[in-house]
């Protein structure tokens, strides 16, 4: 199974700069992580007003972004081993926004997981409760636009001296899993 693929997008630098500006200037609670969460769903239409080239960036793949999350980490415990409860497909596309150099998304097989719902954001994921049969199978540094399998067990490690670590995780009108197969 292929767990990730780095891809090229148009207007990459514009999307990164617009995202960082949006988070700093319009979502300081998220940028500064004053809310006790790492996964912040954003209003897609509002986000696109501040990041007007987002849809153009993915036009070559014939996909339209309809789900935007800012993922903000301060420590390695912020993204312990988990499986996303993403019901709209197997993959999303992640973009590095800030301080991602040297961080890794590590994929596993095995393990036993239990649903967890963040009491603040109401977002659910499956957290590891037993390492039975757990085996590392792959890893990637999110240093460019990357398709990742979010519904497979994974965790993120970061350089805690470079905080916050921010990525954007995007969903689309059709699952970009087809990009893993190209």
Question: What are these language model-derived features?
Answer:
Residues 2-6, 90-92, 167:
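Intrinsic-disorder/low-complexity, polar/charged segments enriched in Ser/Thr/Lys/Arg/Asp/Glu/Gln
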Residues 117-182:
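Catalytic core of Fe(II)/2-oxoglutarate
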Residues 67-69, 73-145:
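Catalytic core of non-heme Fe(II) oxygenases with the double-stranded beta-helix
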Residues 64, 89, 162-164:
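A short, structural micro-pattern
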Residues 7-10, 84, 97, 156:
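Compositionally biased, intrinsically disordered low-complexity segments enriched
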Residues 1-64, 68-69, 78:
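Non-heme Fe(II)/2-oxoglutarate
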Residues 15, 80, 103-105, 177-180:
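Short acidic, gly/pro-rich beta-turn/loop elements at beta-sheet edges
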Residues 11-13, 74, 97-99, 172-174:
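Non-catalytic surface loops within mature trypsin-like serine protease
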């Amino acid at each position: 199974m292929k767990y990730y693929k780095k891809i090229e997008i148009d207007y990459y630098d514009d999307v990164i700069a617009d995202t960082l500006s949006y988070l700093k200037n319009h979502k300081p609670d998220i940028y500064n992580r004053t809310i006790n969460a790492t996964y912040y769903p954003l209003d897609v239409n509002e986000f696109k007003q501040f990041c007007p080239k987002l849809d153009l960036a993915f036009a070559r793949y014939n996909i339209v972004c309809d789900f935007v999350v800012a993922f903000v980490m301060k420590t390695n415990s912020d993204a312990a081993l988990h499986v996303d409860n993403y019901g709209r497909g197997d993959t999303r596309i992640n973009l590095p926004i800030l301080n991602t150099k040297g961080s890794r998304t590590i994929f596993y097989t095995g393990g036993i997981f239990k649903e967890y719902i963040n009491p603040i954001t109401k977002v659910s994921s499956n957290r590891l409760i037993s390492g039975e049969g757990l085996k590392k199978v792959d890893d990637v540094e999110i240093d460019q636009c990357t398709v990742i399998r979010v519904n497979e067990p994974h965790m993120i490690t970061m350089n805690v001296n470079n905080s916050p670590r921010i990525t954007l995780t995007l969903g689309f009108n059709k699952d970009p899993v087809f990009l893993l197969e190209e």
